[in-house]
A protein has these predicted regions:
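Acidic-enriched, low-complexity/disordered segments with a strong bias for Aspartate over Glutamate
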Residues: 4-5, 18, 28, 42, ...
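Short acidic, hydrophobic short linear motifs in intrinsically disordered regions
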Residues: 5-32
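Sequence-level detector for tyrosine residue identity
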Residues: 6, 12-15, 47, 83, ...
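Generic preference for hydrophobic/aromatic residues in regular secondary structure cores
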Residues: 19-24, 40, 58-59
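Basic amphipathic alpha-helical segments that dock to polyanions
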Residues: 25-47
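Short, amphipathic alpha-helical interaction segments positioned at domain boundaries
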Residues: 51-98
Length: 98
C-alpha cells in the first residue's frame, strides 16, 4: 500500500500518541482513504460535533499498523521524515501569510 506524505503524517501522529488515538477531520480525503483501507478506525459510533463544516471524530490506528511500526524502525523513520517535511511545508505557508 502506497501512502503519500500527508497520509504518512496522519499515521505518524497517531502512532506517537500513547493510545494511538487522535481527533481527525471527517471530511478529509486522506482520512477517508486511510479508513477505507483499514489503516485507521473510528473509536466510537457517536461523537458530539460543534461545527459540522469542520467536524472532527476520534480515530485510532488499527493494531496491525501499530505492530508493523513497532517492528520496523525504517518504517517509523520514513513516516517521521514525511511528518517533518509536512511540518516544514506548513510552517513556511504560515510564515508567508504574515
Amino acid at each position: 500500500m502506497k501512502l503519500d506524505d500527508y497520509q504518512k503524517t496522519i499515521v505518524y501522529v497517531l502512532y506517537k500518541e500513547d493510545n494511538h488515538t487522535e481527533e481527525l477531520p471527517i471530511h478529509d480525503g486522506a482520512v477517508r482513504w486511510l479508513k477505507q483501507n483499514m489503516v485507521i478506525t473510528e473509536t466510537t459510533n457517536q461523537y458530539m460535533v460543534s461545527d459540522l463544516n469542520n467536524a472532527v471524530f476520534p480515530f485510532m490506528l488499527n493494531p496491525w499498523v501499530v505492530d508493523a511500526m513497532q517492528n520496523d524502525e525504517e518504517l517509523v523513520n520514513e513516516f517521521e521524515k514525511a511528518y517533518k517535511k509536512m511540518e516544514s511545508k506548513y510552517n513556511k505557508m504560515i510564515s508567508n501569510r504574515y
